[in-house]
Amino acid sequence: MSRSAIQVAKTATHLPDLVEVQRASFKWFLEKGLIEELENFSPITDYTGKLELHFIGSEYRLKRPRHDVEEAKKRDATFASQMYVTCRLINKETGEIKEQEVFIGELPLMTERGTFIINGAERVIVNQIVRSPGVYFKDEQDKNGRRTYNASVIPNRGAWLKFETDKNDLLHVRVDKTRKINAHVLMRAMGLSDNDVIDKLRHPEYYKKSIEAADEEGISSEDQALLELYKKLRPGEPPSVSGGQQLLQSRFFDPKRYDLGRVGRYKINKKLRLTIPDSVRTLTHEDVLSTIDYLINLELDVGGATLDDIDHLGNRRVRSVGELLQNQVRVGLNRLERIIKERMTVGETDSLTPAQLVNPKPLVAAVKEFFGSSQLSQFMDQTNPLAELTHKRRISALGPGGLTRERAGFAVRDIHPSHYGRLCPIETPEGPNAGLINSLATHARVNDYGFIETPFWKVDKGRVIKEGKPIYLSADLEDECRVAPGDVATDKEGMIVADLIPVRYRQDFEKVPPEQVDYVQLSPVQVISVATSLIPFLEHDDANRALMGSNMQRQAVPLLRPERPLVGTGLETQVARDSGMVPISQVNGTVTYVDANIIVVTDEEGSEHHHSLQKYQRSNQDTCLNQRPIVHNGDPVIIGQVLADGSACEGGEIALGQNVLIAYMPWEGYNYEDAILVSERLVKDDLYTSVHIEKYEIEARQTKLGPEEITREIPNIAEESLGNLDEMGIIRIGAFVESGDILVGKVTPKGESDQPPEEKLLRAIFGEKARDVRDNSLRVPSTERGRVVDVRIYTREQGDELPPGANMVVRVYVAQRRKIQVGDKMAGRHGNKGIISRILPREDMPYLPDGTPVDIVLNPLGVPSRMNVGQVFELLMGWAASNLDCRVKVVPFDEMYGAEKSYQTVTAYLKEAASLPGKEWVYNPEDPGKLLLRDGRTGEPFDQPVAVGYSHFLKLVHLVDDKIHARSTGPYSLVTQQPLGGKAQQGGQRLGEMEVWALEAYGAAYTLQELLTVKSDDMQGRNEALNAIVKGKPIPRPGTPESFKVLMRELQSLGLDIGVYTDEGKEVDLMQDVNPRRSTPSRPTYESLGSDYQED
């Protein structure tokens, strides 16, 4: 399998590190962000000004984490480090200085793979894309259809300032969406004279109307302006000049209350062509005057003033982990500041030390809240390595300070020309989040300001210069250049061949001669995201299907024996490597020891490097993480070489599925509507078998009647059921368990009231004290089975942290091998998905001229209407590759090598395969790409030739085992008394409004009546019905549903006198059948569950 297609060599530029976004951001936080926050925070003075507390941020230090990554996962702990910072307390009266190192909280650390471990679970902080601070100019239409312009100054934090024009050519200003104020009133309040303003404007005649309007209102001095400002901003409070002065100062000129941020200052300077230094983060008079000037130029349409496009990526920036965490630390420190000030006031001035003042709790709480419950801190998707990698590169517009799903319109979700090479136009979810959650393109990176950049080669007089490093441009810099796509054809010297080149210039497409091209894109793949770039022949697929293909690759279950694709795109190796699933050699050297658990590499100096491998660990999604060595003892290795395969990897490449022989033809209706017909070979040879590891947990708690006990002595259980339990009552590792088997024996003490009357009678007669415990053991749920692979016991004595009230926690891990079966979902890489409808014996499958039965039969009607023809190219290229015994890498967008290149390449490969001895039948020029198949049942040929070939097919995580569910009786909701919903709650199937209509339409009155009463929430009726069924009697008449009683009670609680009456006008008492001692329901029929159960 050494050969490779011609197409790979030219375009596969090496991608940058794909998790860099996460790592670089966290590194910035540790080196700069945290220090910045600690230093901005000091000094803190008490209310009298006697004491000052300084934080010396640059001297903070982190202690070694208490647990390493593996230990933290095992113990359900957080992988975090303690933060200490030097504090200086200065007593102004005595001049005394106390310096001390103070503990300020725990900071979760990022693992090498860009994740965090919080309470034992791996989490990812998703990057957020938000509107950049700065100044924005927009136009709106007023009621009369006249265009008005407005300018908004948006800070990083603080009050918004919005300038507007109106039909009378007056300028107004709003602060934080309050009432309109004449703009000149604000100028005068800021202490600017009329001449100061007029000198700065290029067209003062427009502005003079606003000055006149201010004079007419009688606001001619600074004091009057401040009073007016105070009245407008704080209506209802007595205005004062000093109040106005303070209000204006704190709103816009106090660095603690108003901050443009580095980015905001950069954007304002750039838009208004100012040269204010980076360190000035508040508003200046110059900013305000330049904004007004620019707005007037817009209104008069002079001076090259342009409107801003809010969806342009030059106006949206990415907030990664570091910045989100920095904001959170700021919140914690602000809470801390209040506490310190109070303690300074209350404490004895002389004896105070910094350690007494600083309480780590608020900071710890803020950081914990961010990692534990922020919308952007997500449980990592670990289904396979690609899912993990994509999750770390995700960019979300949701979250705190971002958009909400309901508010986001079409414009925000749409693809924008500036996304080109920065955000993937294809990979986004289907449904309500479409366009709000994006994926970073393959070559994109985030710069210091948070803008997304993408790389280009410089073009000089028509020659592409590919020396040195490529040049990275952000969206607004790129607008000023003419950029050609990555697939322009060039000759050996790098000169562009064509006469006219399509280029992008200022959001538009035009054609120019090669001399005018400024930059050319690095590679055709740089437009799309990592998942999309793994789809071969992507350019032949419709975008909607490519989207499904990208998303479904992330749901592929790692198989027992992974197989890398016959037809790939050349990026498989890098995806596997950057996902962190494969161990990589850090040094040049020799492998000196290998076994299943560890690989030792000895470098040239003779020191050993140990790589321990993960064996059968459970991932967040219950799939299996396992690493297998691929080097042997004595092998030489180089830096960056892959030492072992992870899950869903083979030979250091990502391998999400299997290459199987596929035929496109209908077969007895079993592949109608996207269903899939598969051969028994896939089951027998374990091609699509995967390992899943379930975690079961039980805790022994302290109850009012005494402690629960984990034990082997369980009442009323036969000895053979306890055969696999050890002396503590915990299952042994390696035991095979079926549904209903006991995993951990547990007994709970029961009180007097728990005993049924017959037991009380027995005890009264015989006087024996039966053991007062009931069986509360952990059992294997229905439909589950497997082998116990691990048991973990946590107790307080071992120093484990347990939940409150628990004395002991036992966890049992059960692994199961799942073969493929009817009802499982499978998919190709081109969005061609389906459900398995039947598994056919090998001998009944259609077979090739050489007798090979096909593995999968797909419906040919799935291709034309969906326009994902890429699957057909992949099929035939795979067919050629398997016959030539090689693997092929095809880079997407191959038209740069000539028109219809895909077609030509595939045909050439097929012809080459057919030229091999004995393989003439592989390619038939009369019917290219099709073969005459025979029916496996009769041996007769089908009447039409069929497209056959090898395709990479995936088994997705939507397995029928996890979905199939049935219920006879089970838990009911407490208020409505209706059965719960969902498999996890052992719930029933919902009979909704539309289903009721259907039954009504057929007049099926009795069926409907029992569905709405005894099968649902008529409590007495369902008990009686169950009783009647058990005893074989006729089922009695249904009563009143509980939900009707709830409705009555709700209406009565509104004060409405509502009741149910008979024809004779007698009121019916709906509550008569309610047992006065309703606390204990009649036992065996149902159990009610509290409302907390429903929320799950």
UniProtKB/Swiss-Prot annotation:
Give the transmembrane ranges.
Answer: none
Give the CC-aspect GO terms. Answer: DNA-directed RNA polymerase complex
Which is a GO BP term held by this UniProt record? Answer: DNA-templated transcription
Recorded hits in Pfam families, A to Z, give: RNA_pol_Rpb2_1, RNA_pol_Rpb2_2, RNA_pol_Rpb2_3, RNA_pol_Rpb2_45, RNA_pol_Rpb2_6, RNA_pol_Rpb2_7
Q: What is its EC number?
A: 2.7.7.6
> What's this chain's function?
DNA-dependent RNA polymerase catalyzes the transcription of DNA into RNA using the four ribonucleoside triphosphates as substrates.
The text of the family note is: Belongs to the RNA polymerase beta chain family.
The name this protein goes by in its record: DNA-directed RNA polymerase subunit beta
